[in-house]
């Protein structure tokens, strides 16, 4: 009898548990690894969305040194980009003209800004006045020739192709019609930024700068319309090395501008076709360098290498006012071939960071007391290109 009662009691307890008399066990909390895997899966699903189902957006592109606005969406889109190749005569420097081959009428071509996972649809037109076919090789594209074959376009024709921006970074695009070096040397290059899905940190000012080397028949400064010199190009002996296609393109009245206390980001490219750039801003230290436009970040950098056909992103805070000179620190290129730019910064002086000259006394020899102050001797006259540098 006792055994029957015990069995009945156990059975009733199991019945109560089955009917919810006991609280249900909670599912284990999601681990960070599981959350990351779920996020990755969601991103992969978005990346695999057929391009025909994506929202369509017309790209906002900009001429240098302006930069398109940051991406403010959290989903992929089909981004339509229109490009036109134009061959035109423009000023290389005062009194010197050159027949440039361009994307959209200037050197560099327009800057393009898209988001990782976007499908980029390119409508590529070659102006009827062009003398040769042109195309575009996007270093941001994965696939045959970066789109060069798909965009090979005769004068007066338009071609269309698309690619998916699979990997974030800052990439060069350039013409790749033979002779490739000649097309690039005449100015056919630009930058496309593929923002990571999470975006880039906010900064106060952004600028677009591309270095290039030019090969004219005449020496630097020789007046008139200067033709391209293939022999100099093959020998890698440029007469001009410049930022944004022209001597003084970002100097003097065209200088970049910022205010003390602002953080500046520069998207720096090197169209080449031959030279590697040693990019430096005199009087500044780069807080961050996105090495070769990729994911790796170096900090506290004085100068950074920008390879031909490559790029870098540099960021720095301008603490005090002044005129900061941008150079290729292969320094004869700066002072003798044109690779000079300016960032003019306004604001209040801060002597805690740097003072003006505090004294000027006559040299008295090692260990001797300073001699009486005397008027400073006149310095040798600076060349026109050096007057605003230091």
UniProtKB/Swiss-Prot annotation:
Annotated residues for binding of Cu cation 1: 134, 175, 183, 188
Region (3 X 5 AA tandem repeats of A-A-S-A-P): 371-385
GO CC, alphabetical: cell outer membrane
Name used for this protein in its record: Copper-containing nitrite reductase
Family of this protein: Belongs to the multicopper oxidase family.
Binding annotation for Cu cation 2: 139, 174, 329
Required cofactor names: Cu(+); Cu(2+)
Membrane-spanning segments: none
Domain Plastocyanin-like residue range list: 101-195, 245-346
Composition bias type Low complexity, residue spans: 368-390
S-diacylglycerol cysteine lipid modification positions: 19
Any single biological process term in GO: cellular response to iron ion
Coiled-coil positions: none
MF annotations from Gene Ontology: copper ion binding; nitrite reductase (NO-forming) activity; oxidoreductase activity
Record-linked InterPro entries: Cu-oxidase-like_N, Cu-oxidase_fam, Cupredoxin, NO2-reductase_Cu
Signal peptide from the UniProt entry: 1-18
UniProt KW Cell cycle keyword: no
Lipid positions (N-palmitoyl cysteine): 19
UniProt repeat feature Sequence, residue ranges: 371-375, 376-380, 381-385
Disulfide bonds: none
Annotated Pfam families: Cu-oxidase_3 (PF07732)
């Amino acid at each position: 009898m006792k055994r029957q009662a015990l069995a009945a009691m156990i059975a009733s307890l199991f019945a109560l548990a089955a009917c919810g008399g006991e609280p249900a066990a909670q599912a284990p909390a999601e681990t960070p690894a599981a959350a990351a895997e779920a996020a990755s899966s969601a991103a992969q699903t978005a990346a695999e969305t057929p391009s025909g189902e994506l929202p369509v957006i017309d790209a906002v592109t900009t001429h240098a040194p302006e930069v398109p606005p940051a991406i403010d969406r959290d989903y992929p889109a089909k981004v339509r980009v229109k490009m036109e190749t134009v061959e035109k005569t423009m000023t290389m420097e005062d009194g010197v003209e050159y027949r440039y081959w361009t994307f959209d009428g200037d050197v560099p071509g327009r800057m393009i800004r898209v988001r990782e996972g976007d499908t980029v649809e390119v409508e590529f037109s070659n102006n009827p006045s062009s003398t040769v076919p042109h195309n575009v090789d996007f270093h941001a594209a994965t696939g045959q020739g970066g789109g060069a074959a798909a965009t090979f376009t005769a004068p007066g024709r338009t071609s269309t192709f698309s690619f998916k921006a699979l990997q974030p970074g800052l990439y060069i695009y350039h013409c790749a019609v033979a002779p490739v070096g000649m097309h690039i040397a005449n100015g056919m290059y630009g930058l496309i930024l593929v923002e990571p899905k999470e975006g880039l940190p906010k900064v106060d000012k952004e600028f677009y700068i591309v270095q290039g080397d030019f090969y004219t028949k005449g020496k630097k400064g020789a007046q008139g319309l200067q033709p391209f010199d293939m022999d100099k190009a093959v020998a890698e002996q440029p007469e001009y090395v410049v930022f944004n296609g022209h001597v003084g393109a970002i100097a003097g009245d065209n200088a970049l501008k910022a205010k003390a206390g602002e953080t500046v980001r520069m998207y720096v490219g090197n169209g080449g076709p031959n030279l590697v750039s040693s990019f430096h801003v005199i009087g500044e230290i780069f807080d961050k360098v996105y090495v070769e436009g990729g994911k790796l970040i170096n900090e506290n950098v004085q100068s950074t290498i920008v390879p031909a056909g490559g790029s870098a992103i540099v960021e720095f805070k301008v603490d005090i006012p002044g005129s900061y000179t941008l150079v290729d620190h292969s320094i004869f290129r700066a002072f003798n071939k044109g690779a000079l730019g300016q960032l003019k910064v306004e604001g209040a002086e801060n002597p805690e960071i740097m003072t003006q000259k505090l004294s000027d006394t006559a040299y008295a020899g090692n260990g001797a007391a300073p001699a009486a102050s005397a008027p400073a001797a006149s310095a040798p006259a600076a060349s026109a290109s050096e007057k605003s540098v230091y």
